[in-house]
Amino acid sequence: KKLKPYLKHMVTGNEVPLDVFYQKDSALAPNMLLRRIPGYEETVERLVQELKLLIEGRRKEPLQIIEIGTRDAAITRQILNVLEDVSVAYTYVDSSKYFLQEAEKELAGYERVEFEMLNLEESMDKQQMALHSYDVVISVNALHRNIDAVDAVKKVAELLKPNGILLMTDLVVR
C-alpha cells in the first residue's frame, strides 16, 4: 500500500527508486523493514554489547575500527555512542557512493568518523584501504550484498590486525 503512489513514477523513470525507499517514505527503507523481523533489534543490541565488552580492557590504546556498509545511521549512532569516551579512529565504508554520502549526512555530527569507499567485490590491492590495520571490523547486514560472501569475508579478514576481531551479524535463510 505504501509503495503504490510511487509505482507509476518509478516504472516511467520519473522517480528514482532509491529516493523512494530511502527519502520519500522512510517506512519503506530496508532498514525499517528489518526492524519488523523478530529478534532483529536484540541481535543488534547483542553486537553493541559485545563491542562494549571488547573495549572495556583497552581504553588506553587507540582502537582502529572500520564499519562496513551498515546503511542504518541509527545502528551506527548506537556504536559510536558506546565509543564516546574511547580513543578510537573510526572509518565507515560502503561500496556505494550514494549510501556513503547518505551516511556522511546522517552522521555529520560525529567528527571522529572518516568515510571511505570499499567494494569487497573488487581486489583489495586496487583500493585505498590499509590491510591488516584494524582492531575491529563491524558488519551489520552488509556481507550478504556481495555476490560471493565467502570471498567477502576473506577480504574482511585482510583488514584485521593479527588477533583483530570481526563483529558481524547478517540475515540468513534457514
Give the predicted meaning of each segment.
Residues 1-174:
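4′-phosphopantetheine-dependent carrier domains
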